[in-house]
Amino acid sequence: MPTPLFHSIASWFLKKRIHQMEHFIKFPIEVQQQVLQNLLYCTTQTEIGKRHEFSSIATYETFKNRVPVVTYEEIADDIERCRKGTQNIFWSTPIKWFAKSSGTTNAKSKFIPVSNEALEECHYKAGKDMLSLYFNNNENSQLFTGKCLRLAGSK
């Protein structure tokens, strides 16, 4: 069982994230532009990045005009190649994992490539953000001092 010291350190660490979240709220457009630029930079040399010339995209407008919205079926062959081990299709670092959808269309599950960066910056960070918001709104919480039940995943 976690100690009070662990609880204090964990809650302090999680509360620090609130300042970043407040920055996102104050500057949503700038933050989104920065995220887009980072994603474009990281994918410039991928098959998709070369196909749509990500290296010459500097604005959201250019991205919107150059990169079409596609259905899963339109990229299914690329995803299947990725599942079989071909790298550098969608992302510049190795894809080792795939999220599996519940199959809401065509009654088939879909596989979504998941990079290590996606795990860190989306999946894991979302959990940390929820805890950060919880501690920010419940300053006297003793969440880490007792037992807890965690549920996760799909089939």
Predicted regions and their residues:
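Nucleotide 5′-phosphate-binding alpha/beta core
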Residues: 1-100, 106-155
